[in-house]
Amino acid sequence: MVKFCPKCNNLMLPKDGKLKCAVCGYEEETTAEGSKEYEYKEHLENKKEKITVIESEGLETLPTTRIECPKCGHNEAYWWLQQTRCADEPETRFYKCKKCGHTWREYD
């Protein structure tokens, strides 16, 4: 059963035998029987990332930027964006050195 906060209409979450709104702090007592109804479980899955590797063909069409390669020190690289995490998180920026071909990433 899902319960929403009567003050701000956000989802109430179980905490220490009570239901609590994470937004406004409103709390509501639950009965012993009702507390099982609101039990909160979080399941994490071990997800493997699938990362696209950009081969040398087609690199000329990618934008370039001035950034130092951590491997050879060259100051120019191709770059592209790719969604590697949840959709509500920012994209990951990948770089590929124009000189040595080393690829690395930066998270925003």
Swiss-Prot record:
Zn(2+) 1 binds at C5, C8, C21, C24. GO terms for biological process: DNA-templated transcription; regulation of DNA-templated transcription. A zinc finger (TFIIS-type) spans 65-105. GO terms for cellular component: DNA-directed RNA polymerase complex. Zn(2+) 2 binds at C69, C72, C97, C100. Induces RNA cleavage activity in the RNA polymerase. In its presence, the cleavage activity of the RNA polymerase truncates the RNA back to position +15 in a stepwise manner by releasing mainly dinucleotides from the 3'-end of the nascent RNA. The truncated RNAs are able to continue elongation. Involved in transcriptional proofreading and fidelity. Misincorporation of nucleotides during elongation of transcription leads to arrested elongation complexes which are rescued by TFS-promoted removal of a dinucleotide from the 3'-end. PROSITE patterns: RNA_POL_M_15KD, ZF_TFIIS_1, ZF_TFIIS_2. GO terms for molecular function: DNA binding; DNA-directed RNA polymerase activity; zinc ion binding. This is Transcription factor S. It comes from the Archaea. The keyword Electron transport does not apply. Belongs to the archaeal RpoM/eukaryotic RPA12/RPB9/RPC11 RNA polymerase family. It comes from Methanocaldococcus jannaschii (strain ATCC 43067 / DSM 2661 / JAL-1 / JCM 10045 / NBRC 100440) (Methanococcus jannaschii). Keywords: DNA-binding, DNA-directed RNA polymerase, Metal-binding, Transcription, Transcription regulation, Zinc, Zinc-finger. A zinc finger (C4-type) spans 5-24. It holds the Pfam family Zn_ribbon_RPB9.
